Amino acid sequence: VRHVDASGKDQTRSQMRFQRNAEEHAKHHLKKVVAALKDLDKTVPFDRLILGGPSRTVAELERLLSEPLRHRVVSAVTLPVEADRKTVLEETLRVDEEFEHRTEMSLTEALLTAAAKNRMATAGVAGTVRAALEGRVRTLVYPRDFAVFAKDCPTVPANGGGGMPLTEFLGEPIKPEDNLLDLLVENTAREGAKVEVLHGEAGLRLKEAADGLGAFLRY
């Protein structure tokens, strides 16, 4: 008669079952997160998604996302499971600000490059105002604290010659000290065009390179 000690094998099998159960529970939870994101997108549509958590969990979550949701992921942040709400919010805001900065800098450089090559873009107050008056603006771009006063904004005839101070703008009488930006933005929106407001470094870059105003054009 031989006596076989199976306690070690039993313990190993028990650990394996526990591990499988834990993994299945985690995957079930991640699927619930994905379902919640889909429901949220239906009620409150969003265009960017930041994932946070332990790196392995984040990777698995991203793998489970549908293609449309995966394309909206702008960053993944490694956070411990026990991270509190304040830590999560701070990291989310930091990542979002970095994303905004990169996006706005990229937009600004693309605008300046296209304008320099005369490829469906213009940079500078006179050219942008002229494009707005002609209904050619596709996307208006300016810094958050920007102002364009009538006294500093000449009309530029189509033949490119001369220029006089504006006394009327988009059918509205104006004074030399009036800020035209509100009228410009309203007209842009009315024409079905987009408006992009720059912050921080991107806004400074546009001010230095193009007096703070530019636009991508329809034609």
What role is predicted for each listed range?
Residues 1-219:
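Terminal alpha-helical anchor/extension segments at protein ends
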